[in-house]
């Protein structure tokens, strides 16, 4: 028997499915649509979208974000990766930081007693669940008229961030650290999406400045 085929076939099968994702233009359209809504809920949803677009975080990681995780003086964001249990300290990028600031100052209910960053807009102002976040993101995608292939939830932004970093030739180890992957193997499914030629883009990652 051919040993190689017996060993490789199961590995290839595991990565056969190509993740759904969003293009750069689609993400821009979603953000531009969402930012027009300056209601408290709109400010909240826009901050969530910025965290998704900038960092590629999981919905659960954003849902469990605490007020103490945002260090405005050090300009950092502390993320507890729900799937792996790891912690990552990320730079507070301008877009995400500005959106968070506007939401916390003008959108988040003053009466909210919990320490979670994102809360529901109606009393008793409980933490926004992962399910609630999924629904909010899906509404914003639909409101922007964006029709991605496959599921229309927060993970689309995570896939897009992974692909953009792969296309920018950022090492898989760095990508894994940013996304909170348990191993570099977790980035392999995105390689199928990262094969197109793109125009020049800049991406800032701690300790790295990479251009296509």
Language-model segment annotations:
Residues 1-212:
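Conserved catalytic core of the tyrosine transesterase superfamily
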């Amino acid at each position: 028997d051919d040993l190689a085929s017996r060993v490789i076939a199961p590995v290839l099968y595991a990565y056969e499915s190509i993740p759904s994702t969003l293009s750069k233009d689609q993400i821009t359209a979603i953000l531009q649509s969402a930012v027009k809504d300056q209601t408290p809920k709109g400010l909240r949803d826009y901050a969530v979208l910025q965290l998704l677009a900038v960092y590629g975080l999981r919905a659960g990681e954003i849902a469990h974000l605490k007020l103490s995780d945002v260090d405005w003086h050090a300009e950092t964001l502390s993320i507890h990766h729900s799937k792996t249990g790891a912690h990552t300290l990320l730079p507070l990028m301008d877009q995400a930081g500005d959106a968070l600031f506007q939401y916390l100052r003008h959108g988040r209910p003053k009466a909210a007693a919990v320490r979670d960053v994102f809360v529901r807009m109606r009393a008793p102002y409980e933490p926004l669940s992962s399910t609630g976040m999924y629904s909010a993101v899906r509404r914003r995608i639909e409101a922007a008229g964006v029709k991605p292939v496959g599921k229309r939830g927060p993970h689309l932004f995570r896939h897009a961030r992974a692909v953009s970093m792969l296309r920018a030739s950022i090492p898989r180890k760095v990508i894994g650290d940013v996304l909170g992957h348990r191993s570099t193997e977790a980035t392999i499914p995105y390689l199928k999406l990262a094969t197109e030629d793109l125009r020049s883009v800049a991406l800032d990652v701690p300790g790295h400045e990479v251009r296509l």
